[in-house]
Amino acid sequence: MAARRRGWGSLRTQRSGRVQASYVSPIDGQRYFGPRNYDNRMDAEAWLASEKRLIDNEEWTPPAEREKKAAASAITVEEYTKKWIAERDLAGGTKDLYSTHARKRIYPVLGDTPVAEMTPALVRAWWAGMGKQYPTARRHAYNVLRAVMNTAVEDKLVSENPCRIEQKAPAERDVEALTPEELDVVAGEVFEHYRVAVYILAWTSLRFGELIEIRRKDIVDDGETMKLRVRRGAARVGEKIVVGNTKTVRSKRPVTVPPHVAAMIREHMADRTKMNKGPEALLVTTTRGQRLSKSAFTRSLKKGYAKIGRPDLRIHDLRAVGATLAAQAGATTKELMVRLGHTTPRMAMKYQMASAARDEEIARRMSELAGITP
């Protein structure tokens, strides 16, 4: 049946008896049809009236665009967070960590809440409900939610970020740097098969995940200068070890090995009981030739830390030892950033430790500036 002309829009009765409504938008000149055929003219008229009202109020956008926006605004915090994590260019271990914080602390309370309905009051109640028993995990979960909501602002799902809780910066660990002599004592207590890992971590500042993915093909050595080409990292994701990109783009870097450590690595590589042949052979492994796990290395390393009376130290502190030693050797902040694979000076500075012996040396040199020889 032909369309019946009206003052605005048109109605067409189909063979089925249902009514099809449409109109030509004065905004873009395109014809738009109702989302469905209506049972009666009254319902079709109502749809046309609502569209005309949007045009008159200068609020009109194409129906498909409105439907897409409505669907997006209905997405829940859990759905959006999962999408956010999946789309981020993050190392596998980082994605797993974010997913864990979200699964344990965000989804149980806020997961079913539409992103568009998130408010500062909801965030404050969620924050208070987590309690203060696990401050680090609580802070990390909040940081994940805040980052997710920042993207929601960019996607125009919310007008502003509802995460506005002022957090005190976590207290920095006051850790004194190890001396080379103490490092030797620590290494002496570590299982001999992968003892070289202690020296590599401490003198090159590699992350543990970077070290356990270094292969023979990643070692460039002309007999005088040795470089480790950091290109990949390994991390535990759930029950599996996943090899992927390094933590950041800057983390892909060549790291020059101090000559005395390079000599240790050459000796280690020449021992077929410690490293297999072939370009894909891992530099450090278990006695069975498998990838060295963080837990196994930690158990061995803790014995060394206990030997020097420093049970508070962790694996990652060896990276900070390396940053400190490099700074003491004269590395600039920019050079430290490159060596550690950091993107900001703040992060490079954060990894440096204080040294009592170094402080005494600085004090002596200050007296020398005054023309006084101690």
Curated annotation (Swiss-Prot):
Residue span, Tyr recombinase domain: 173-364
The keyword Hydrolase is annotated on this UniProt entry: yes
Keywords: DNA integration, DNA recombination, DNA-binding, Hydrolase, Transferase, Viral genome integration, Virus entry into host cell
EC number assigned by the record: 2.7.7.-, 3.1.-.-
Cited PROSITE patterns: CB, TYR_RECOMBINASE
GO biological processes: DNA integration; DNA recombination; establishment of integrated proviral latency; symbiont entry into host cell; viral genome integration into host DNA
Active site annotation, chain numbering: 207, 247, 316, 319, 342, 351 (o-(3'-phospho-dna)-tyrosine intermediate)
A molecular-function term among this protein's GO annotations: transferase activity
Pfam families, alphabetized: Phage_integrase
Every Core-binding (CB) domain range: 75-153
Keyword Cytoplasm: no
Alphabetical list of InterPro entries matching this protein: CB, DNA_brk_join_enz, Integrase-like_cat_sf, Integrase_catalytic, Integrase_recombinase_N, Tyrosine_recombinase_XerCD
Highest taxon in the source lineage: Viruses
Function text: Integrase is necessary for integration of the phage into the host genome by site-specific recombination.
Family according to the record: Belongs to the 'phage' integrase family.
Protein name stated in the entry: Integrase
Organism: Mycobacterium phage D29 (Mycobacteriophage D29)
